[in-house]
Each structure stands twice: as C-alpha cells, then as structure tokens.
Design a protein with these regions (language model features):
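Solvent-exposed alpha-helical segments within well-ordered globular domains of core cellular machineries
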Residues: 4, 8-11, 20-24, 41-42, ...
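Interdomain "pre-motor" coupling segment immediately N-terminal to P-loop NTPase/helicase cores
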Residues: 7, 16-68
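Conserved phosphate/pyrophosphate-binding and hydrolysis machinery centered on Walker-type P-loop NTPases
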Residues: 12-15, 29-37, 62-65, 77-81, ...
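N-terminal pre-Walker A segment at the start of P-loop NTPase domains
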Residues: 70-94
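Conserved P-loop
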Residues: 85-161
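Walker B motif beta-strand of ABC-family P-loop ATPases
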Residues: 164
Length: 253
C-alpha cells in the first residue's frame, strides 16, 4: 500500500487526523529515527487531538451563542471593580455544573451580564460540558410555538437534559402571558438535575410583574435560589461609557 492508498484507507476508517499528518509524521520518523511504537503513538495522539478540536467546534456551534467570541480574557474587570471577580472565575471552573447548581447574573443593561454568561458557557464547553444558550424571549416563544405544533414535550425534554442552559436577558422584551408557567416548568425539570445561568436587568422583586404570574415566579425563584450563585453586575454601563466617550470626542472637535 503506497502513501496515497494509505491516506485513502485512513479516511475511510474516519481517521482523518492521522491522514492529515501522515506524510509529515513519516518524514519526522525517518529524521528522528523513531521507534515504530513511538510513531504509532504520535499518530494516535494526532487523531485524538483532531477529534477533540472537532468536538469543541461542534459544541460551540450547537450552543448557539449570540456572541461566540466572548471570553473572560476579553472582559474588562477594571471597568466595574466592585464586581465579584472571585465568583466569576469560580463559575468559569464549571464546578457549579458538576454540583448541579445555578447562577443568577443581575444588573442594569450594559454591565457585562451577557458577556460573562457566554464566557462561562465557553469555559464549560472546554471542560467537556454541553451548553445551550438562548435569549429569554426566543426561548419562551419557542416553547409557546412547540405547544401549538405538538412538539412541546420533546423540546422541554431536550432543554431539561443539557448540562448548562443559559437564559439571557430576561426582562429586555415583553413576554407572553404564559411565560411564568412555561419558565417554571422548565426550571422544575432542571432543578437539582442540571445547571442554569440566568441573566436579567430587572431585580427579582419585579419578576412577578414581568412574567405575569406571581405564584409561578415565587416557585421559580425558590428553586433557582436554592443552590444559586448570585452575581451583581455593574453599576457602570459599557454602553453609557461609549456614548459619553463619543460626546466627549465631539466636544473637542
């Protein structure tokens, strides 16, 4: 079997990681006089690395992040120094997911809640967890649509089992009258079974008015807060800072 035939055989066996580097590794083996076992070990390591990279890429895509490049490395901790940096880094370890705990990120618009939630989600993927990201209004609308077309049971089953569900921007848009009950059912299915990160620009005392069902919200908060890490974001807003900087630039022209 020549090199071309070997490459084709490896790809048929779905060993594309080996096939991609085969020629280079064979040259390396000759140059370094590698033992056969060392060459095989190196090729296997190449295959495992490629599969891991493809798995991470697939999970990042499946997560559905709104801003897929968000990370803790790109978050400006100096802008809001009062934020609990230790808690943020603790959440990024994903230990709270292993312990089936939740996290609430609360604060005014523009204070970094969505950035941090997605950064925590990316960190969780790197540590082997599946993650689903949904903006609150699209999640609630999806559940309502699934109720109408008969797929509600399947949708809730999928959402209930993902190890980390991120519900972003609760309170940014008006929600349907069924939002409270739908969100409660989802959280009850996940309670002590999987982790949820929820961000909101509204204090929890306002959630009854927001979701239109005080009783459902009371039960919802009871479960969310039972094993929850609460991060207060702010008080300074990045959006306000940008507008202020722009006004300052205009004033100096």
């Amino acid at each position: 079997m020549n090199l071309i035939e070997l490459d084709q055989a490896l790809r048929k066996l779905r060993l594309s990681g080996m096939a991609t580097v085969l020629e280079a590794r064979l040259r390396q083996a000759q140059t370094e006089r590698m033992a056969p076992i060392d060459l095989v070990s190196t090729l296997v390591a190449d295959e495992l690395l490629r599969r891991q990279d493809r798995l991470l890429e697939r999970r990042h895509k499946q997560a559905g992040f709104r801003d897929p490049d968000r990370s803790l490395d790109t978050f400006d901790f100096e802008f809001n120094r009062k934020m609990n940096r230790a808690l943020i880094h603790e959440l990024a370890t994903a230990r709270f997911i292993a312990q089936r705990e939740d996290a609430l990120l609360l604060g005014p618009p523009g204070t970094g809640k969505s950035h941090l939630a997605q950064a925590i989600g990316r960190a969780a993927i790197l540590q082997g967890y599946r993650v689903t990201y949904r903006e609150a209004h699209t999640l609630i609308e999806a559940i309502a649509d699934a109720t109408l077309d008969g797929t509600r049971k399947d949708l809730l089953a999928d959402l209930a089992t993902v190890p980390l569900l991120i519900i972003d921007d609760l309170g940014m848009r008006k929600l349907p009258a069924t939002a409270g009950e739908d969100l409660l059912e989802l959280i009850m299915r996940r309670y002590e079974r999987a982790s949820t990160v929820l961000t909101s620009n509204r204090p929890v005392d306002d959630w009854g008015k927001l979701l239109g069902d005080t009783a459902a919200v009371t039960a919802l908060l009871d479960r969310l807060l039972h094993h929850a890490h609460v991060l207060k974001c702010g008080p300074r807003s990045w959006r306000t800072k940008v507008h202020t900087d722009l006004r300052s630039e205009e004033a100096t022209k």
